[in-house]
Amino acid sequence: MTGSWNPTSIIIPVTLSFLLSFIHNFADVVAAPTRHLCLPEQRDALLELKNEFEIGKPSSNDYCYRNNSRVSPHPTTESWRNNSDCCNWEGITCDTKSGEVIELDLSCSWLYGSFHSNSSLFRLQNLRVLDLTQNDLDGEIPSSIGNLSHLTSLHLSYNQFLGLIPSSIENLSRLTSLHLSSNQFSGQIPSSIGNLSHLTSLELSSNQFSGQIPSSIGNLSNLTFLSLPSNDFFGQIPSSIGNLARLTYLYLSYNNFVGEIPSSFGNLNQLIVLQVDSNKLSGNVPISLLNLTRLSALLLSHNQFTGTIPNNISLLSNLMDFEASNNAFTGTLPSSLFNIPPLIRLDLSDNQLNGTLHFGNISSPSNLQYLIIGSNNFIGTIPRSLSRFVNLTLFDLSHLNTQCRPVDFSIFSHLKSLDDLRLSYLTTTTIDLNDILPYFKTLRSLDISGNLVSATNKSSVSSDPPSQSIQSLYLSGCGITDFPEILRTQHELGFLDVSNNKIKGQVPGWLWTLPNLFYLNLSNNTFISFESSSKKHGLSSVRKPSMIHLFASNNNFTGKIPSFICGLRSLNTLDLSENNYNGSIPRCMEKLKSTLFVLNLRQNNLSGGLPKHIFESLRSLDVGHNLLVGKLPRSLIRFSNLEVLNVESNRINDTFPFWLSSLSKLQVLVLRSNAFHGPIHEATFPELRIIDISHNHFNGTLPTEYFVKWSAMSSLGKNEDQSNEKYMGSGLYYQDSMVLMNKGLAMELVRILTIYTALDFSGNKFEGEIPKSIGLLKELLVLNLSNNAFGGHIPSSMGNLTALESLDVSQNKLTGEIPQELGDLSFLAYMNFSHNQLAGLVPGGTQFRRQNCSAFENNLGLFGPSLDEVCRDKHTPASQQNETTETEEEDEEEISWIAAAIGFIPGIVFGLTIGYILVSYKPEWFMNPFGRNNRRRRNTTTH
């Protein structure tokens, strides 16, 4: 029936609706505990923790890494609010049953501050994961960290934490991951760390840890990842590390380990990466390492290893990266190396490998991309089998002894992937630049420095046009006499070094038409000028904005500094030193004030004063050995990035620039040989490492506390990694240099070590006592106070200068004894105490017994075994000298009285007789030679 009622049509939908509603409500009931589990005391602790730190404001350029992805910093704690569920806060994970916080991830949260022992963090007793990576937290880790006994992961890397690892760390017995890298932790690794038996990952790299690695580290049987590089560990590598059978990654680079690699490392058959480079390891590499068949990376570079590379090294069949450069390996290069299929990088440069080269029988295309075997003792030619390395991108065979046979450059035409070729200092025949460039269609960098290169300006003999892909070309020391015209077509050229040649004439103007040229080194040639702007390719008509580094030192340039330089608006480094430029420094260089970081105009004939309104971005300014006059411009105070200021050997007439102490980055100050005068005011130079104000007219006394705030010379070792040499300079392209009096000689520092410290106040008119505060400069290497008027005693505090190598206090007015404490300065190789008023026992230290006698001469009464030893026949003990002198004086006094008596009586008789004659007779024979007329003549002559 149409329109009749069907009960099922209503029952079914109602039933379904009821079921859906029931399921939904049931789900809410079940899910409710996971959404509202925040415990009030946990929330309060987190909010208090939030207030313990400052939150920075990252800029758009700041970034950090999370899960190997680059992300922007994010202030995680800003989203924490009192009126919301803390288990839903960012960075918080709660236990689903108890509601307690078990994970706290505040990595990359821009937090500042330090932990206190009563931090609210330690109230989160059930915390399992704590990640504070990549913040700016500092201070020590309080021992209260040991209260978080449930921790399994503790990650504090990339902060500013310092001090020791707290001993309470051993309470974290459940810890599986401990990451403390890239902080300032110091001291030794506590041996109790060996009790953390669940540890699988230990990351302590890039800190200031020292001492020996505790052997207890071998107890961490679950460890798979151990990273300790870039610290100050020393001693031998503990053989107990060989017990870590599960270890897959072992990083020990950049420390001071000595001795051999433990043979027990051969037990680490799960090892994939072994890095022990940049230490002081020696001896043979244990043959047991050939057991590590899973090894993909073996890094042994920059040590003192000896012996040969085993022929069966191909047993390491998974090796992808083998680096053993800068050692003392001998023997031949095993051709079996080239039979390791996965091998991508091989670096054996700077060893003593010898013999002829054989690259083996390569049956299939090699995966090798980097073959670096230069600076050895190989002889012969380059094997033609090199062409089989079809994936090769970098090849370095510098210093190959080809026995004066030519190099077959056609080999390289088969290497379609070759990007970087280094063949410097071969003993080959002349290389014709015009002939070889056509072989390189894809090459971007070519180094043939130190070879005899012909660059005759002619058309290429090859039918192929020369490559136009080269971006970097090294032609230093090639005996070139004419600028290579073939470079004119190298439009991709960005880096060109033609230094140390014999190129004469003008620097060609077409150079400036190369649109990508950013580095040009013309130093040590015989150039006379830059091509005039009136020429066809003159400097006024070309684009020059790409030039960043220009070196033209030690040539024959004359006249004024060319004004075209002012148009190099991107210029970062300008070195025109050791030429014959005259006139003043161009004012147009003001156009470079925002880009120029390094300006070296040393050893020219420049005159006038230093400009007042340029160079505000400078990091290094050297105008020494010119004819500059006037005063130091006070505008220097605005050079906030200035690290080096050298104005030596000019005619600057000014008082001491105490106001330079406001330059917080100033490290080198040289005012030597000018006309500076007056007292030197007390000033704070927190980063100053080298100061030379010698040979001026400074006077007055030095305040007792003068050196108290010279912190860089006092505690340099705390701030610098002295295990690896670092030099002052702007990256790869420029390194500062200077001349300094050291050990009595003028020593040229071609590069300035960042840990080098020196103080030279010699050749002035200082008086008074040497300040006792000089003993605070514990990092000082050179101290020269000679040729002044210092008086009083040499301060015994100088005995604190434990790093001192050279001490000169000669030509002063010092009195008293040489402090016995100086005898304990084991590095003091040179000393000079001469020309003072010193007396007493000379210290008996070994270094004192190695000096020349002249170091002690012209004093009042120095004596002692040390002096007897260094002077030997030249020296008579002071006490004996005094006795001899007194006896001689007594004898001379007796003789004088006798002589006086002998002459006295006849003298009286003669005097009375002459007096009688003068009064009575005045004879003419007497008056002519001795009388009035002669007196008149003498008076006239005198006037």
UniProtKB/Swiss-Prot annotation:
Ranges per topology, Extracellular? 32-897
Q: What domain of life does the native source organism fall in? A: Eukaryota
Q: Which residues are glycosylated?
A: 67, 82, 118, 147, 171, 195, 219, 222, 291, 312, 354, 361, 391, 457, 521, 524, 556, 582, 605, 653, 699, 784, 800, 832, 852, 882
The principal location of this protein is membrane
Signal peptide range in chain numbering: 1-31
The chain's Cytoplasmic topological domains, given as residue ranges, are 919-943
This protein's GO cellular component annotations are: plasma membrane
One Pfam family name from the record?
A: LRR_8
Cell compartment(s), UniProt: Cell membrane
LRR repeat segments = 124-148, 150-171, 172-196, 198-220, 222-244, 245-267, 268-292, 293-317, 319-340, 341-364, 366-389, 390-414, 415-439, 440-463, 467-490, 491-514, 515-537, 544-568, 569-592, 593-617, 619-639, 640-665, 667-685, 686-709, 753-777, 778-801, 802-825, 827-850
Per UniProt, which keywords does this protein have? Cell membrane, Glycoprotein, Leucine-rich repeat, Membrane, Receptor, Repeat, Signal, Transmembrane, Transmembrane helix
The membrane topology term of the UniProt record is: Single-pass type I membrane protein
Record-annotated membrane-spanning stretches = 898-918
Similarity remark: Belongs to the RLP family.
What PANTHER family does this protein's entry cite? LEUCINE-RICH REPEAT-CONTAINING N-TERMINAL PLANT-TYPE DOMAIN-CONTAINING PROTEIN, RECEPTOR-LIKE PROTEIN 12 ISOFORM X1
What is the protein name stated in its UniProt record? Receptor-like protein 35
* Source species of the chain: Arabidopsis thaliana (Mouse-ear cress)
